[in-house]
Amino acid sequence: MPSGIGLLNLRVVLFDSDIYALQALNSYLAWDRRTRVMFMTPNIHEFWEYLRITLAAELPDIVVLDADHLGGATGLRNTLRRIQDLSPHTGIVCMVQSLQEPELAQVAAEEGAKAFLLKNEVRLRIAWAICATVEHDMIVTSEVQRATHDISNRRLYNAFILPEQRDYPEMTDRIRQAIRLCVIEGMPAHLAADEMGISLHTIRGYIKEGYRILEANDHYEYPTDMTPQERAFMRFTALADER
């Protein structure tokens, strides 16, 4: 089975000042049985209050943290330390919109964060990245690795580079679009057909062919109660080396 399916059940808390990014993260994680979003907020005060009042047994396994808007390197360091004080066993995944401040990655590494990811790189792979933190000391995306190669930090130097999303060469752009709309975004077929300017019959054909391609390139067995749509989501978002 794919890494951790049936084994992992990670409690996740999301903080991102961008409400649209927050909703996207929640949506992608909701599709993956290995991750369970317990709380999300764009408000840092609500974030602290949640950690403060939550029972120790119910504290998150993972916090996904918008590291761009915390007051630079000093603000990030203070935030990471406070999270660790409130929830010592929680892994922290830092995400940034840009790499204009590579020193943020250094701070994340020094303070024990489990990942430092560029949002535009990780995209649909966020659940896979979170689950990979269980197996690796630290994870970065490839652009983060390039931007920090001259920073002297053992954890950054040895960090696991998140693989690219699995490629499906057989999948045409139109089939890929249909899969994205109906599987990733969860859009009903008739609305997706209207969005693409095609008939309902045609989009159903695209989805059927997309499912066939996804299954042909995947060798895992899945829990019997997983729907075809769940399997398709897992396969479409899988990492290149997860076969």
Residue ranges and their predicted role:
Residues 58-62, 76-79, 174, 195, ...:
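Glycine-rich, flexible loop segments associated with nucleotide phosphate handling
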Residues 151-156:
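Terminal C-lobe "cap" of eukaryotic-type protein kinase domains
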Residues 158-204, 208:
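Helix-turn-helix DNA-binding segment
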